[in-house]
Amino acid sequence: MLEGMSLGVAPRQTDVFATTTSFCEGRVAPDSIYGLLHRECFGLFPDEMFADLFCDVGRRSVPAMIVAVVMVLQRIEGCSDREAVERFTYDVRWKYAAGGLGFDYPGFVHTVLVDMRARLAASERPDRIFEVVLQTAKRAGLVGRRRVLDSTALYDAVATMDTVTLVRSAIRGLLGACAADLEGELRGLLGRDDDYRTAGKPVCDYDDPAEREALVHALAEDARALLGALDGRQLTAAVARAAELLAAVVGQDLERGDDGVFRIARRVAKDRIISTVDPDARHGHKTSARGFDGYKGHVAVDPDSELITATKVTAGNVGDAAPAPDLLADDLPDPESAGDGEPAAAVESALSVYGDSAYGAGALLDTLEQADAQIVCKVQPPVAPAGRFAKDAFAIDLEAATVTCPAGQVTALRPLSDGQIARFGAACTDCPLAARCTASPDGRSIRLTAHEAQLARARARQSDPAWKADYRATRPKVERKIGHLMRRAHGGRRARVRGQTKIDADFSLLAAAVNLARLAVLGLTHQTATWAATSA
C-alpha cells in the first residue's frame, strides 16, 4: 500500500488577473536572456531606433522593439522564421522577454522577420542590433582594451558542384536572367540537345572517357557561343552578373588543348567558385588536414568580460589575418585624427591584441606596431626542409643589408618586388656545412619579406617567459566563445542563408544574442542615466 496522498483535481477556472510577468517571475531566472530582455528591452531596442526603416505614412508595422526581441531569441535558439513566430505566439517566455506582453497578445506572420532583415540590410546601419548591445556593454564598463582574435568555419547552405554541373548551371542561370527576346536569341546558338530548363547533372555515361570528354567540350562550346553573342552589348545588371559568373566558371575549370578540344583543367584555380547557387562560397582550410566549403566567421573578443566586440564573415579561402584590421577598426587610432604628435596611449591605455600563429603576418604586425599596440600574436619560427639550417641560423643585418651564414660567409641583400634576397652561390661549393644547409647546385639563398623587421621583433618578444604566460592564459578564451557561437542549439556551423552579405548580417545578429546572454549573467541593469553590471 502506498503512503497516503489525496487526489489532485484539475482547476476548471483560470486566474483572469494572471499576466506573463506574474507567471514568469520566480520561474524564469533573472540572469537569463529572457530576464534581461524583460527588464531592459525598451531601453535596448526602443522603437525609435528603427524609425529610419519605415515611412511616415501607411499601415502600422508590428512594433519594431518586439520584432528585434524575436530576432534575437530566434538566433540564440536556432529557430526558423516560422518556428520563431510560433514560439512568440505560444511560448510565454518570449512574450515575457518582449516587455511582459499579455498572454493573448497576437502573433504575426513569419514574413515580418523577412521584411525586417531586408530593411536592415538596405539601411546605413545594418548591424545596429549588435552595435547597440556592444555600446551598452561599453557604457557599463565591461569592455576593456584587450582583444583576442580567431576565426571558425561556417559551412555553406548549398551543395558543392562538380565541373559539369557548375558549367551547365551557369549556362542555365544566364538564360534565366535574360528577357524573353534575348533568351530566344541565345537559345538559337546552343549546340547541345539540352534546353537547360531543369537543374541537375546532364545524362552521360561518365565511365566512358570519350563520352565524358565530348560532354565537357559541348558545354564549353555552348558557353562560348553565349558569351560571344553578349560581348559588347549593353546588358542589365542581372544578365551582366550571370555572364561574368559563366565566364569565371569556364575559365577556372576548363582549358583548351592543342587539338582545340576543351577539357577539365588539371589544376585547381586559386579562387575557385564551387557553386552557382552561392557564388561567394569557397573551399577553405582551418588546418592542412581539415578542409570545408563555405565561409569563415571572424571574431574579436574581450577576454575579461568574454564579450564579442566585432565580427566579420569572409570567403573560406581568406586568411585569418586579412580581416583583422576590420575587427580592430574601432579600437585602433584613426590616422586622420592622430595629428597632434601625442600617442594614443596618452588618452587611453594601449590596445593589446592576442592571436595564434595565423595572425603572425608581417602586414598585421606592422599595422599594430604603428598603432602602438601591445602585440601578443604568435609568429611561427622559420623552418627548412630535411632539418637543414633555417633562416634564424643566419645573421641578418637589415641596416647593413647583409646576411652572414653559419659558416661565416657574408653576402649582400638584393631588392625584389616584394622584399629582398641574399644568394650565396659559389660560396657554398666548398663549404664544409653545405650538406646541412642546401641541396641546390646554385647554393643557398635567403629570402626576406617586406616586413622582416616586424617578424624578427615579434619572435624576440615571444621568447620572454612573461609573454608566454600571458599568451597561454588569455588566448584560449576565444575558443570557448567560439564554442558558444557554434552550439547546435544556435544552429551550429551550417549557414542559414546564402551569400556573404546575408551570412555576415546573420553572424552579427548571433554575436549580439550571445552577448546579451553574457550580459544577463554579468547582471546588466539600467541605473538612472547609465548602465551597470552588478555581477562583473
Regions found by a protein language model. Give the residues of each.
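Basic, low-complexity segments
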Residues: 1-57
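Helix-boundary capping/turn motifs
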Residues: 42-43, 60-64, 87
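Short, hydrophobic/aliphatic alpha-helical segments
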Residues: 50, 91-92, 464
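A short glycine/serine-rich beta->alpha loop
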Residues: 53-60, 497-500
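Catalytic micro-motifs at enzyme active sites that drive phosphoryl/nucleotidyl and oxygen chemistry
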Residues: 59, 97-104
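Alpha-helical support elements that line or immediately flank enzyme active sites
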Residues: 66-78
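Anion-binding and metal-coordination hotspots
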Residues: 80-86, 101-102, 106, 111-536
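DNA-recognition alpha helix
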Residues: 84-96
